[in-house]
Swiss-Prot record:
One of its GO terms (molecular function) is DNA binding. GO terms for biological process: regulation of DNA-templated transcription. This is Probable transcriptional regulatory protein LSEI_1022. Keywords: Cytoplasm, DNA-binding, Transcription, Transcription regulation. Belongs to the TACO1 family. It comes from Lacticaseibacillus paracasei (strain ATCC 334 / BCRC 17002 / CCUG 31169 / CIP 107868 / KCTC 3260 / NRRL B-441) (Lactobacillus paracasei). It holds the Pfam family TACO1_YebC_N.
């Protein structure tokens, strides 16, 4: 994992994502609904819900939207969703994982397949790609107005129980074992750190450079996948070229 900057690749796609704010809120509403339905509406006793609520707040999701999603979870007649993961390769042979929440597996499987194959990729069998990724806790702390140098940040992160840290000009990226994520997050919060992002994510063991002549197709594939109402997350092993 050392040397891999998830933040660099996120920033490489940020402008495209900023135009999808309404779609992001819709997906977060579904995640909030499912987390509350499965574990109850109180985030203090439902770690999964707290994670999604942190994610919603980081996305500046309106409080009314959050409340509606949580209220809906108490409706016994409301829809239920299955968690499904699809595996494949995008343009240039770059590994991708697609996580979805769906009430119709056939529909979602079809739309995911179309999005991937239309742009020169292909679907893969279960397990063909997922072994290339590790589940990790992921925390991002912006360096803006942060009066802490890299050595101090690393010391605090390791003391809290983190596994690894990556540094860029913009941020510190902290990776944890998923089982230790809440402990690390809470310990750093107690020290006064604020997170730009904090979540459980899938981190590629190795990055694959996206060929420059494939970048446009790769981005178009991700855009189409993220436009799908059922798709919650798209993870790639792609290393985006610098602008």
């Amino acid at each position: 994992m050392s040397g891999h900057s998830k933040w660099h690749n996120i920033q490489g796609r940020k402008n495209a994502q900023d135009s999808k704010r309404g779609k992001i809120f819709q997906k977060l509403s579904r995640e909030l609904y499912m987390a509350a339905k499965q574990g109850g509406p109180d985030p203090s006793g439902n770690p999964s819900l707290r994670l999604v609520m942190d994610k919603a707040k980081a996305a500046n999701m309106p409080k009314d939207n959050i409340k509606r999603a949580l209220d809906k979870a108490s409706d016994r007649d409301a829809a239920n969703y299955d968690e499904v993961t699809y595996e494949g390769y995008g343009p240039g042979g770059v590994a991708i994982l697609v996580e979805a929440l769906t009430d119709n597996r056939n529909r979602t499987s079809s739309t995911v397949r179309v999005a991937i194959t239309r742009h020169g990729g292909n679907m893969a069998a279960a397990g063909a790609v997922s072994y290339m990724f590790d589940r990790k806790g992921y925390l991002v702390i912006s360096r803006d107005d942060l009066d802490v140098d890299e050595d101090q940040m690393l010391e605090d992160a390791l003391e809290a129980g983190a596994e690894d840290m990556q540094t860029s000009d913009e941020a510190f990226e902290i990776y944890t074992d998923p089982k230790e994520f809440a402990q690390v997050r809470d310990a750093l919060e107690e020290k006064g750190y604020k997170f730009v992002q904090n979540e459980l994510t899938m981190v590629p063991q190795n990055l694959t450079p996206i060929p420059e002549d494939k970048v446009e197709k790769f981005q178009a594939m991700i855009d189409q996948l993220e436009d799908d109402d059922d798709v919650q997350e798209v993870y790639t092993a792609g290393d985006w070229p610098d602008d």
